[in-house]
Amino acid sequence: MSTATMPYVAFKVKDISLAAWGRKEIELAEAEMPGLMALRAEYKNEQPLAGARIAGCLHMTIQTAVLIETLIALGAEVTWSSCNIFSTQDQAAAAIAAAGIQVYAWKGLNEPDFDWCIEQTLFFGEDRKPLNMILDDGGDLTNMVIDRYPHLVEGIKGLSEETTTGVHRLYERVKAGTLPMPAINVNDSVTKSKFDNKYGCKESAVDAVRRATDIMLAGKRVVVCGYGDVGKGTAASFRGAGSIVTVTEIDPICALQAAMDGFEVKKLNTVVGNADIIITTTGNKDIVLGSHFEQMKDKTIVCNIGHFDNEIDMAWLNKNHGASKIEIKPQVDKYTIAGKDILILAEGRLVNLGCATGHPSFVMSNSFTNQTLAQIELWKNSAAYNNDVYMLPKHLDEKVAFLHLAKLGVELEVLRDDQAAYIGVGVDGPFKPEYYRY
């Protein structure tokens, strides 16, 4: 579809009357997002994103609304869709629409609507100007532009990617020689992956399961599939609730970390039959298969906190046992296998946004401050980059962390000149080499 044949739709949300509620929650979130608010204050006069038309595809939550309005405060025009069919908070989408921003998102999208919403973000206003920047989470927007709208690519200065799955897709494109613009990998900034992925999941994983099921977690046997940053936060989340946690892993380093953090590390086949809750965190496909479902005990809860729904073999489950499916409530479904009930949360999609409201505002401020800095960097300096995947430099990573310290009452020591010289760093940083692993 070309610009000329795509009609202008100002917005599409579930219920615009929710805007006042959403605005109150946005104002509350702003107080917990010091990084974004600091960037608004720092750049309000400079307007570093003036002229940028940023199409965003990222969970349309209250916290994302603060990001959107930060990008606009820095001079950008913005359109938005959600990267997950269940993750939109309808009051947030309504508030953004009421502010005159093109947003296309509501909770409970079907797949055709999901694609339609992304497509609407490619063109701006009634004059249908095309996007010139991408802000993505998972790669669906990026892939749509490159694969279905290649004529738009030349006008795009760059893209920033939020999550592990999307970054993996970008590196696949680099390897295949099909990435046509520079990209910044926001996910692997220290202040994203070690905070959003870990500390965010530490709070939101348990929150989602509790809201969905009202189950008592203390004493329950939980299997966490994967022990990367998301898995680490998820395992800690359930252990903090008193659950007995077992981890599964393919990576010997992550497996050793899990063991030395005090978790048993076992093969899924050996523990699936005794688990009360199984949660996937890997970013890979086909983790929980039909053979695993057949071993599960009655009332096992199965969910996923990775980006896509293919970590759990929902296709097998629906093909073989779909006739038994009963919706308990939205995003909580019961399947019956050989007389045993299995509870699936959020249809195998991202459980913390499908069954709850995702990560807390403060930790999302870390991630979204990185996103904002990445957009500024690519918009102002895209000519300095090749068609490859880049990281934000260390000094910006440290800046993101610094902007969040005062909110927590943190006081930093200051290096003397001789101390800085002794360890080979500047008095004002960066304080660690690029290869340092936090």
UniProtKB/Swiss-Prot annotation:
GO molecular function: adenosylhomocysteinase activity
Coiled-coil portions: none
Residues that bind substrate: T61, D137, E162, K192, D196
First-level EC class: hydrolase
Subcellular location: Cytoplasm
GO biological process entries: L-homocysteine biosynthetic process; one-carbon metabolic process; S-adenosylmethionine cycle
Pathway: Amino-acid biosynthesis; L-homocysteine biosynthesis; L-homocysteine from S-adenosyl-L-homocysteine: step 1/1
Cellular component GO terms, alphabetical: cytosol
InterPro entries linked: Adenosylhomocyst_ase-like_sf, Adenosylhomocysteinase-like, Ado_hCys_hydrolase_NAD-bd, NAD(P)-bd_dom_sf, S-Ado-L-homoCys_hydrolase_CS
Job of this protein: May play a key role in the regulation of the intracellular concentration of adenosylhomocysteine.
Protein name (database record): Adenosylhomocysteinase
Lineage, uppermost ranks: Bacteria, Pseudomonadati, Bacteroidota, Flavobacteriia, Flavobacteriales
Gene: ahcY
